[in-house]
């Protein structure tokens, strides 16, 4: 860090004055695009609160922001002065606005990198090869990709790859209020679903606060929840992510019925009832519970039981209850039971 920059930071000087986000939107004739699920957050008190929810951001840290748009949250991040800020934005219309923010950050020795890319395809590991610096993931997520992105990141977290090669990469993200509540839903809650269990296997999700829809432009028909997801230091399972995700997805496919109904669809019909009962006994889980009444340990014991079963009957792993009937798989499983 240069002596000039040190003096700037020590003096408490802030970023140079910029047009407000509302002025920038008007200046560049920016309009939110429905197909990109865009909603702009104009209130800097709220963007500051989102970034504050991420916790301490040190001068050596890297922040990756998803979908900065006109730069509301971006400005709040820059005030925290990370060493590097990576912006991943799919919509090139925001280029001039984001370039202006980069120029304002440059005198303070903050590196701002802008990538016009789809976060679902963005290779974080390629752009952040160094694992000595802590990473924060922050974003006002488009509603249309939020669940898919989160599941992708959980897969990375389970494999210790991408942004999660260290075990301290926290995610501070916005979701539709209903989705945010599902992520954090406890056992027995009517809102508990696949996303609840997957989130709670690999992270500790914390609902930070709710933003009313009227704070966004254009105003969405729903309120928004800000959730911080803190990776667990010790994972709750060593099973492959894909297997756990498959089992949990099947369990919750019939969430209002007894959990054995959804779980049973993992198995060919010829041996389904008997095998399902056996696996529930192995897992020490009552099969008359409904899926939203299952705890994370119970779901993982059911995943363990299924993993052991497909070791004994490898042909069952390929079974897909939605596909065409496969007498070879059903017959083989029944014969070997």
Swiss-Prot record:
UniProt KW keywords: Methyltransferase, Mitochondrion, RNA-binding, rRNA processing, S-adenosyl-L-methionine, Transferase, Transit peptide
Q: Which Pfam families match?
A: RrnaAD
Signal peptide location:
none
Q: Which residues bind S-adenosyl-L-methionine?
A: 38-41, 67, 89, 118, 140
Alphabetical GO CC annotations of the entry are:
mitochondrial matrix
Name the NCBIfam families on file: ksgA
UniProt family annotation: Belongs to the class I-like SAM-binding methyltransferase superfamily. rRNA adenine N(6)-methyltransferase family. KsgA subfamily.
Can you say what this protein is called?
A: Dimethyladenosine transferase 1, mitochondrial
